[in-house]
Amino acid sequence: MRIGVDARKLRDGGIGTYIRNLLTVFFGRPEGHEYVVFLLQEDLGSLPRQGSPGEEVKVRAGKYSVSEHWLLARAARRAHVDLYHSPHYTLPLPIQCPAVVTVHDLIHVRFARFFPAGAGIYARTIARAAVRKARIVLVDSSHVREDVREILGVSTDRVRVVPLGISKEFTRRPAAEVERFLKERRLPSAYFLYVGARKKHKNLALLIDALERLPRSERLPLVLSGPAWRPAHPLAQRALHAGVSSCIHFSGTLNDESELALLYSGAALYVQPSLDEGFGLPPLEAMACGTPVLSSSAGALKETLGEAAVLLPPSEPQIWAEAMTELLQNSLRREELIRRGLARSRGFTWERTAQLTMEAYAEALDGG
């Protein structure tokens, strides 16, 4: 089978992680398949070369652009692919071969008020067109399957739940390595941690409000992954008015998953306050690194994390502050969460994700 994969979002956060890990497993066990990977100019050469069953094809189609429909359809036709996979909710409408599309979430539709005017309508339109065109629709969780059914009107008999996986890099790191990394990054030795984007639906305002309510003796610094925010950023202003600006630190840009694993391993508690998630990869990665997790129960988080995390509604900062305090003070509860988290995280592998995806490819070729 000659499989075309749209990899234009290779650098885009969680979707990029999905594409990269899926292709890594596919390339490692080609099983007679060939892969045509459609990439933007800046990503050419980023895939394994020697002995790889993957062929790179440059496309100039902007992500979520109108032109992507005919440019990608033409590229797929010229590459003679037997099946086309879009790893996000756009699909070239003129595509002639069987197609599979992955819908990671419909947050742009569910929380349209958090995005620029018209973004929600556009997202709904292109996602609905994509899932109607595709023979098989992949989703990360049962939560997203229900969203696809309710919001996009797709019968669930064409939808397959394919959970994401965790990279083998995410393991508990030795204390000496963690200490060295934290010193290099000028980060505190004990901290709460959040990893991910800072979009409004991530609900970081809840963490700021919870920090404000913590007793000073329990007010560990909060480390956010990525670069520092600008002083004028609404969250920076909120932290300033709450009197907790000095408690917030930033990891800076992380070079690879190994550094992220060190950041997870050093945290006293990982916190995930999201209003919605299609899966919830960062808290699962934190679990794999031996860090206890306090998470929102919204979206797919309850489904993904199960009983291995403390789950709370994403709305009451006082309740979050009390839970953060309790998890710092109660060593038995912490150890229990660590054990459960390590066990839970072992159930999610990219090999399983790839296997279920390949089964969906075969089903799509057989007519869906």
Residue locations for each model-derived region?
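Carbohydrate transferase catalytic cores enriched for Leloir-type hexosyltransferases
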Residues: M1-G368
